[in-house]
């Protein structure tokens, strides 16, 4: 895990992939199966490894919580 601040260009790229790619793909999916969740988390893990900064992982975790709330009908 990289403990240095994330460079602006990498932060911008990470946010684009997290929000406009990964989150957009999963945010409105209803009735996710265990296989869906496995794929969702696996994709997020890959992004976490790609960027390897605590901030990216924390934002990813927050987005997973949002997807969980939406699954519970909280949107």
Where are these regions (language model features)?
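N-terminal acidic leader/helix
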Residues: 1-33
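Short, charged, amphipathic alpha-helical segments
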Residues: 34-42, 57, 61
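Short, charged early-sequence alpha-helical segments and their helix-coil boundaries
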Residues: 49-75
């Amino acid at each position: 895990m990289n403990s240095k601040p994330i460079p602006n260009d990498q932060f911008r790229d990470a946010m684009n992939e997290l929000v406009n790619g990964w989150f957009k793909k999963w945010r409105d999916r209803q009735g996710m199966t265990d296989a869906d969740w496995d794929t969702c988390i696996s994709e997020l893990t890959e992004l976490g490894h790609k960027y390897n900064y605590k901030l990216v992982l924390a934002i990813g975790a927050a987005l997973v919580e949002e997807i969980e709330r939406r699954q519970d009908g909280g949107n």
